[in-house]
Amino acid sequence: MSLSNWPLKKEQSKAHNIKSTKQITIPDGLWVKCFDCGLLMYSKVLKRNLKVCPQCSYHFQASSNERIDQLIDQGSWEPMDVHLISTDPLGFKDQKLYSQRLKDTAFKTSLQDAVQTGVGTMLGQKVCLGIMDFRFMGGSMGSVVGEKLTRLLEKATQERLPAIILCASGGARMQEGMLSLMQMAKISSALEMHKKENLLYLSVLTSPTTGGVTASFAMLGDLIIAEPKALIAFAGRRVIEQTIKEDLPDNFQSSEYLFEHGFLDLIVPRTQLRSKLIQILHLHTNNN
């Protein structure tokens, strides 16, 4: 090679190296970074640990389908009212029509609304289970959520079964106005009928549980259980501080703070939740 061609060859070699580097790609979703401690881990490692960080025990949000897989005996799940869908009684529109938002969210999540309900077994013990899903419009409680949970509790009362509801919600769904707010009383009324039959209701609060859900069925459990460091509140922290003109503690509205002040009965890590629920169910069954 002549000396005059050497710079050209060098540039071609550099371009080849750059091209080769660009071809190295990492598949989307392969890695997950913990929001709390910053640990970088394989997604499958996180999933295997029930979406709990193996280093700091931070609890990632879990979908309703993941919750069913985590809690219910394999092959025993019988879903209820899967075809119930919300209408748009107010013709509500913000950035888009509410009716279109429902369709878009249903397509994205493969859910019809923000709760799944059904009957299954936990180590052979039959239970009625409702699982709210924060992915569907922030787990907001509209007429379908209220109707599905009410039907679930009525079935539990009729068949004399314990009921468990896993809460994950931003509160009442503003797009349905008063129809959303009335679900608080509707579900609470069904719970009262369940209670009069001396049947067990367990409320499990996950992050976040706020607004009208907190103000109704989330806090009506015979035992109220929460995941660690869950955000549990009615109004937002900033709203309260501006109203009372005082600074709030750093851990205010956390499950640990509420436990210390007597609002919760148990704080149970997700990895132990199934075994703890089974233990409570068996204690209740053996004493009745």
Swiss-Prot record:
Functional note: Component of the acetyl coenzyme A carboxylase (ACC) complex. Biotin carboxylase (BC) catalyzes the carboxylation of biotin on its carrier protein (BCCP) and then the CO(2) group is transferred by the transcarboxylase to acetyl-CoA to form malonyl-CoA.
Family, similarity comment: Belongs to the AccD/PCCB family.
Domain of life per record: Eukaryota
Keywords, alphabetical: ATP-binding, Chloroplast, Fatty acid biosynthesis, Fatty acid metabolism, Lipid biosynthesis, Lipid metabolism, Metal-binding, Nucleotide-binding, Plastid, Transferase, Zinc, Zinc-finger
Protein known as: Acetyl-coenzyme A carboxylase carboxyl transferase subunit beta, chloroplastic
Protein source organism: Porphyra purpurea
Domain CoA carboxyltransferase N-terminal: 30-288
Pfam families named in the record: Carboxyl_trans, Zn_ribbon_ACC
Pathway this chain belongs to: Lipid metabolism; malonyl-CoA biosynthesis; malonyl-CoA from acetyl-CoA: step 1/1
Record-level GO BP terms: fatty acid biosynthetic process; malonyl-CoA biosynthetic process
EC number(s) on file: 2.1.3.15
Subcellular localization(s) per the UniProt record: Plastid, Chloroplast stroma
Cofactor mode of binding and number, as noted: Binds 1 zinc ion per subunit.
Zinc finger (C4-type): 34-56
Cofactor(s) this protein requires: Zn(2+)
Main location: plastid
Subunit structure: Acetyl-CoA carboxylase is a heterohexamer composed of biotin carboxyl carrier protein, biotin carboxylase and 2 subunits each of ACCase subunit alpha and ACCase plastid-coded subunit beta (accD).
InterPro entries: AcCoA_carboxyl_beta, Acetyl_CoA_COase_Trfase_b_su, ClpP/crotonase-like_dom_sf, COA_CT_N, Znf-ACC
Residues reported to bind Zn(2+): 34, 37, 53, 56
GO molecular function (one): zinc ion binding
A GO CC annotation given for this chain: chloroplast stroma
